[in-house]
Amino acid sequence: PAAPEPAPAADSVPGLHVQTYCIRAVPCFWMADTVGKLLDAVGNDVRPDDRTLLRVLGAIQPTAAACAGVEGEVTAAPAAVAQAFIRWLTGLAARQPLAVHIRRAGEMDDVSRGVLEYLLAERPAGLTLLTEDGGALGDMPSGK
């Protein structure tokens, strides 16, 4: 039998790359990890119109609240957090190619999985979602 095609090299995708991790037992962990890693990568180079989204994302990632100039604990409804994550991620990807490498994707928490499935269905321009072996992420099992 023929050998399987090798996965595309991670560096074959241009733009910003972040390595993210999943922990099933922690709600929103993948989203929080992604936000934190992206903020580490872009530094304080945050657009003023992103600050509102980052303020909401502060409910799951304290670094986002700090970037938005918010002090203290932030609370937000889960739907607001999911929408802010989707809008911020797609906005970043529209401005520069963005590759999110997902490690332990099978261990993703349910909230993040729902958001990931939304992103996979919408396929926003500039956003590439990759598994830990560097392959592009297709439909993931729902874990149900």
Residue ranges and their predicted role:
Residues P1-K144:
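Key residue(s) within conserved catalytic/signature motifs
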